[in-house]
Design a protein with these regions (language model features):
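Short coil-to-helix leader/linker segments, especially the first N-terminal amphipathic alpha-helix
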Residues: 1-10
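Active-site-adjacent loop and "lid" segments of alpha/beta metabolic enzymes
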Residues: 6, 14, 18, 27-32, ...
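Catalytic domains of carbohydrate-active enzymes, especially glycoside hydrolases
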Residues: 44-61, 258
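An active-site-proximal structural segment forming one wall of the substrate-binding cleft
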Residues: 48-49, 84-91, 107-113, 173-185
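Acidic (Asp/Glu)-rich catalytic clusters
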Residues: 51-52, 111-112, 129-138, 183-187
Length: 289
């Protein structure tokens, strides 16, 4: 089942790589061009800078996932949801709208009010998330994470000796831990998996992300489409010695490689250029072999 229907949008085998553009209604978010708190301005940005430039999906974040900031409660996210709802109601163009949240309560409210899918960076740490998405019959992105709402992506900090076995923990590579985290909670029929690129914890290393790139095809063994979020990430900056606003070229190179190695969805702030890079990776890469 390496394909999923997301509100009529086919994702995975038999479909072109899909582009997920980003809108943040959170002032804490690290990339300023995507941050809006006025629904009219946000809707204009979505229409002109995301959908018109080639975004198939618009992912709306209610808070920054940056570990430097405190995690919002579900109630605090719900307080910001009205801006997100009013924004998508004002958008004139067609797209699939995704709500980024770790809370099933927030996902349920967003889906009931017009959102089409969920992006869960905590990988079903909220035990009600999978059931909520199944009840709404929507696609959901599950990022590789420990079962902890406060530590998205921090799979290397899990006590794997206790969760699996001391022998498994001693032999496991970083990607083995990502795959184990994704497999721990049941995947819904419409789950898309995310291998958690980027600096999600203090112990995450550049070597970890290199290993993930090298083994990206392994995530297809989960029999689900794969989403990668690599746009302007710090690990790319480390490789090329560039700050965030100078990392577009590095991001595009990584995008083509990711699609070549099996990625089905690319999450990005730079929609038009990322779309082009993804199409090149698709046309000349190995993902269709």
């Amino acid at each position: 089942m390496n394909s999923v229907d997301a509100a009529g949008l086919g994702i995975g085998d038999g479909h072109p790589p899909r582009i997920m553009g980003v809108l943040n209604v959170s002032e804490e978010s690290p990339y300023d061009p995507s941050v809006y708190d006025d629904p009219a301005e946000a809707a204009r940005y979505v229409d002109e800078e995301l959908i018109d430039e080639g975004a198939d999906i618009v992912d709306v974040g209610l808070e920054s996932a940056n570990k430097r900031f405190d995690v919002l409660t579900a109630e605090e996210e719900l307080d910001r949801l009205d801006v997100a709802i009013e924004t998508i109601e004002r958008v004139a163009s067609d797209a699939v709208f995704s709500i980024e949240t770790r809370y099933a309560e927030v996902a349920d409210a967003a889906l009931a009010r017009g959102f089409d899918m969920v992006n869960d960076i905590c990988g079903f740490a909220d035990p009600a998330m999978a059931e909520t998405c199944s009840e709404h019959d929507v696609a959901v992105v599950k990022m590789a994470s420990p079962p902890d709402l406060g530590r998205p992506g921090a799979v290397e900090e899990v006590d794997w000796a206790s969760r699996k076995s001391p022998e498994w923990a001693a032999d496991a590579e970083y990607v083995d831990k990502l795959l184990a985290a994704l497999a721990e909670a049941p995947l819904t029929e419409k789950t898309i998996v995310d291998p958690a690129f980027g600096g999600w914890s203090e112990t995450k290393t550049l070597a970890n992300d290199r290993e993930t790139f090298d083994r990206l095809a392994d995530f297809r063994e989960l029999d689900r489409p794969v989403l990668v979020s690599i746009n302007r990430k710090n690990f790319l900056g480390e490789l090329v010695g560039r700050e965030t606003d100078e990392r577009l070229a590095a991001s595009l190179g990584a995008t083509a490689l990711a699609v070549d190695r099996g990625a089905d969805v690319i999450r990005t702030h730079d929609v038009a250029a990322t779309r082009d890079a993804a199409l090149i990776g698709d046309a000349f890469g190995r993902r269709r072999d």
